């Protein structure tokens, strides 16, 4: 049975969301077992079976639109029309039955909806995309006001495991000096709190209803894939859609 995480937030009627773990698939080590990524060296047949299991367990209304994630800030609006490119790190929809999805294995997945339950989005926020403004770009796609938007921070590498160089801290502080609070000196490097950085960025554009942000993909090795921990590994995915 595929084990899913159901986000704990004030989800309005008409919106559904879930996030996968590594549990309940057919992939063999090091992709064991619910790997959803077709780009990381796993057997394609295993990935396809894993996706089928996930779609059934999550009761997804349609196949998600998989993005070509590049650690940037572009948002793909899912209109149902053919896409010239799926090269983006977030997707937005106001169409029932269209599934927004992002893949992660340490980077931060962020799911969005408005309180009226008429708009949804999903964003992939590694530190580069987060620093560049992928969350702000995603919020800007909403017709609703930021104060009416809810955000859920899905499983990512935790603040005790995310070691970065000083250049990462400097990049965030160049945008917002308050970002320094999310970094703790650790030898000649820093431990970064990607959840705190995301909350700061969202609050700066008026999104204050923020949930989640309490898991660690790096240390919870039986539950999550982690690229930093294992290098060759699978991918989880987070999904949101209008019913």
Question: What are these language model-derived features?
Answer:
Residues 1-243:
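Active-site microenvironment for binding and transforming phosphate-containing groups
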């Amino acid at each position: 049975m595929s084990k899913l995480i159901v986000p704990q937030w004030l989800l309005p009627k008409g919106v559904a969301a879930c996030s996968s773990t590594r549990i309940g698939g057919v992939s063999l080590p090091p992709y064991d077992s619910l790997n959803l990524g077709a780009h990381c060296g796993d057997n394609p047949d295993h990935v396809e079976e894993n996706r089928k299991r996930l779609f059934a367990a999550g009761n997804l209304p349609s196949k998600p639109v998989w993005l070509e994630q590049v650690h940037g800030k572009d948002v793909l609006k899912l209109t149902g029309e053919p896409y010239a490119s799926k090269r983006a790190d977030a997707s937005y929809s106001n169409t029932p039955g269209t599934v927004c999805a992002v893949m992660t294995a340490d980077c931060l997945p962020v799911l969005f909806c408005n309180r009226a339950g008429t708009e949804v989005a999903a964003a992939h926020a590694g530190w580069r995309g987060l620093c560049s403004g992928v969350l702000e770009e995603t919020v800007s796609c909403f017709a609703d006001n930021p104060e009416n938007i809810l955000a859920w921070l899905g499983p990512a590498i935790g603040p005790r495991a995310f070691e970065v160089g000083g250049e990462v801290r400097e990049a965030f502080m160049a945008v917002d000096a308050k970002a320094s609070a999310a970094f703790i000196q650790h030898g000649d490097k820093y431990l970064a709190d990607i959840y705190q950085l995301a909350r700061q960025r969202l609050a700066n554009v008026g999104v204050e209803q923020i949930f989640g942000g309490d898991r660690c993909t790096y240390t919870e090795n039986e539950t999550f894939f982690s690229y930093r921990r294992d290098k060759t590994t699978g991918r989880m995915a987070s999904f949101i859609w209008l019913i």
